[in-house]
């Protein structure tokens, strides 16, 4: 014989219990492949700056 939970008790949430002890740390992961340093060339930098300035001027912003 199974008993049904009354409707008014179905959505009641009880407070959380105390936190358990911290577990042991896991093993250290493998080091990934070393990539490029992430810095572009001076030509790439100048291209980005000129594009940014063009966008600022076309939108009415910027100080140049």
From Swiss-Prot:
GO cellular component: viral capsid, decoration
Residue stretches of biased makeup (Low complexity): 15-40
Subcellular location per the Swiss-Prot or TrEMBL entry: Virion
Principal location listed in the UniProt entry: virion
Signal peptide interval: none
Segments for region (Disordered): 1-40
Entry keyword set: Capsid decoration protein, Capsid protein, Virion
Quaternary data: Interacts with the capsid protein gp13.
UniProt function note: Decoration protein that binds to each capsid protein hexamer after capsid expansion and forms spikes at the surface of the capsid. Each of the 60 hexamers has three copies of the decoration protein gp12 in its center.
Name of the protein in its database record: Decoration protein gp12
């Amino acid at each position: 014989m199974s008993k049904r939970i009354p409707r008014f008790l179905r959505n009641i949430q009880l407070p959380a219990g105390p936190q358990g002890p911290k577990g042991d740390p896991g093993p250290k992961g493998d080091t990934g492949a070393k990539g490029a340093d992430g810095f572009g060339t001076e030509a790439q930098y100048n291209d980005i700056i000129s594009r940014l300035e063009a966008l600022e001027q076309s939108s009415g912003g910027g100080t140049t």
